[in-house]
Amino acid sequence: MADLETYFKELVDGRRKAVADRLLLAFLTPFSLVYALLMRLRRATYASGLFPVRRLGKPVISVGNIVAGGTGKTPTVATLARLLMARGKRVAVLSRGYGGSLAGEIRIVSDGKTLQATAEEAGDEPYLLAASIPRLMVVVGADRYRAGRLAEDRLNPDIFILDDGFQHLRLHRDLNILLLDSRSPFGNGRTFPAGLLREPKSALQRADIVIFTRCVEGDPPKAGVAIDKPICRASHVLTGVVPLPGGQAQPFAHLAGKKGLAFAGIADPAAFFDAMEKEGLSIIATLAFADHAGYGEDEIAAICRLKEASRASYIVTTEKDAVKLASYLDRLGPIYAAVLEVRFLDEGVVVAQLEKLLYK
């Protein structure tokens, strides 16, 4: 599965240049045009009122993207939640629970005090948010309106954050935040399946604020299109590693001089591996799994075999993967989770939008 995902990304990015690859991309292009038309029609049905848009009793902030893959939605949600909680707000995150086993069931993952679902049930991203941010409430369910109503009935939130909500048009939002990866904001500019766009670039007009993620401080984002919305730059910052199953966070220098194995089941595992090396780790072996991969006997055995073959003395992975490894830690030996934060380089832009919503 991971190999297929990698091939598809390389195909639409233009890195696959064989004749067969070019023919495949040409074959997919008409389907891409049809998909774009369908997305425009879908958007129009909600905008016209033909499909109902439901409204919760408390304000909703949506965080999402228009490009498939990792733009940093989860760490951005975490940063927003902390900003709101620092202002005394009771925050509830509404998530689909992608990759979890609940199959559409509405479930409270955290009531702000205790965890009430496992990572396998809730999905890795909702569970990570619930486990890593004290007092944050998290509810999962395919129907985010029903999930929000459950939260209103039982948790009494002041405000909601809708995780990966840009395309969830059936729920009204009071602030629509769109994330774009500064390295490649729109991929090859085509919609699925000939590109990575989940909907046409014209969807930018629905955003109230655009956040460019993975920015390098001082470098202006390059979108290639005019954006008449407030813009914030954000950087991804790795702050250190935490030993599993838990313990004091350590700087990356803690692993200096040791040879490590890195694995990840995220949208862009190669970026994670590169980041580990940039932090000074000596990574001698890597293993990529599909995004939101579940970890069972086969996956753990593959990691253990590679660790033994490479003679790595420790393993490092992402926080998102780490929450799914509790049953296997004794077999993996020394293992660490790299801690990632999103920091707003133009925080005032975001805060102004939040305060406009909170105090209107």
Curated annotation (Swiss-Prot):
EC number: 2.7.1.130
Binding site for ATP: 67-74
Record bears the keyword Nucleotide-binding: yes
Keyword set includes Lipid metabolism: yes
Pfam families listed in its UniProt record: LpxK
GO annotations of cellular component type: plasma membrane
Pathway in which the depicted protein is active: Glycolipid biosynthesis; lipid IV(A) biosynthesis; lipid IV(A) from (3R)-3-hydroxytetradecanoyl-[acyl-carrier-protein] and UDP-N-acetyl-alpha-D-glucosamine: step 6/6
Superkingdom, taxonomy of origin: Bacteria
An annotated GO BP: lipid A biosynthetic process
Reaction catalyzed: a lipid A disaccharide + ATP = a lipid IVA + ADP + H(+)
Single GO MF annotation: ATP binding
Signal sequence segment: none
InterPro entries per UniProt: LpxK, P-loop_NTPase
Keywords: ATP-binding, Kinase, Lipid A biosynthesis, Lipid biosynthesis, Lipid metabolism, Nucleotide-binding, Transferase
Family label: Belongs to the LpxK family.
Protein role: Transfers the gamma-phosphate of ATP to the 4'-position of a tetraacyldisaccharide 1-phosphate intermediate (termed DS-1-P) to form tetraacyldisaccharide 1,4'-bis-phosphate (lipid IVA).
Protein name per its UniProtKB record: Tetraacyldisaccharide 4'-kinase
Organism: Geotalea uraniireducens (strain Rf4)
Underlying gene: lpxK
